[in-house]
């Protein structure tokens, strides 16, 4: 397991964690170093995780395209990118084209204590396309959890990993609930 300190100190790490749930059903979580620190917890709670330190929105788009070519895109895709580089409207539109009209794109707002902006494109896209995009507002949620972060104010301590996992889990589970008759075990999702 990679700790948040390892993720922060050892950029270059990539974590691909299979989901603990049903194959092909698990939400896919694509992220950068923030998600990298929480990858193990996310995979234990039903997500297929692909996280890489310093991953850019463009690299995330390339990953989605490669998975589409392989026919390996689930119905729900969670994207948590933009800690280092802002996500643009163009990036989001490219993701939507790759995912098509039947999948849901869940966008996580990045939290940067030193830079309180950079979530505008994500928020606008979620408002404009509520049927296809769901906002997961980590930026707002994280403001109340100073103790969740290491000294850089961005990467997660264990308590932050739990809060981050809970937020993503609750958002994805609310989307999955109707498909599995409300049974979290059938959807491969456990409580955080």
Residue ranges and their predicted role:
Residues 94-99, 124:
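Long, well-ordered alpha-helical scaffolding segments within enzyme catalytic domains
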Residues 100-105:
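A short helix->loop->beta-strand "cap" motif at the edges of active sites that frequently abuts
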Residues 116-192:
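Catalytic His-Asp segment of secreted/periplasmic serine-dependent ester chemistry enzymes
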Residues 21-94, 112-120:
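Conserved SGNH/GDSL esterase-like catalytic core that processes O-acyl groups on lipids
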Residues 1-28, 70-73, 167-169, 173-192:
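N-terminal secretory targeting modules
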Residues 30, 50-52, 108, 136-141:
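Conserved beta-strand termini and adjacent loop/short-helix elements that scaffold enzyme active sites
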């Amino acid at each position: 397991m990679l700790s948040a300190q390892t993720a922060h100190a050892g950029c270059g790490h990539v974590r691909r964690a299979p989901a603990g749930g049903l194959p092909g059903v698990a939400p896919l979580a694509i992220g950068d170093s923030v998600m990298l620190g929480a990858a193990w917890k996310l995979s234990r709670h039903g997500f297929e995780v692909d996280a890489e330190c310093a991953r850019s929105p463009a690299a995330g788009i390339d990953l989605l395209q490669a998975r589409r070519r392989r026919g390996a895109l689930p119905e729900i895709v969670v994207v948590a990118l933009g800690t280092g580089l802002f996500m643009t409207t163009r990036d989001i539109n490219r993701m939507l084209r790759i995912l098509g009209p039947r999948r849901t794109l869940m966008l996580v707002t990045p939290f940067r204590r030193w830079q309180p902006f950079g979530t505008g494109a994500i928020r606008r896209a979620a408002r404009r396309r509520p049927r296809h995009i769901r906002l997961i507002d980590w930026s707002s949620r994280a403001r109340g959890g100073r103790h969740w972060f290491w000294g850089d104010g961005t990467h997660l301590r264990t308590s932050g990993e739990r809060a981050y996992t809970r937020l993503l889990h609750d958002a994805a589970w609310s989307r999955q609930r109707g498909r599995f008759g409300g049974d979290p075990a059938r959807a491969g999702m456990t409580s955080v």
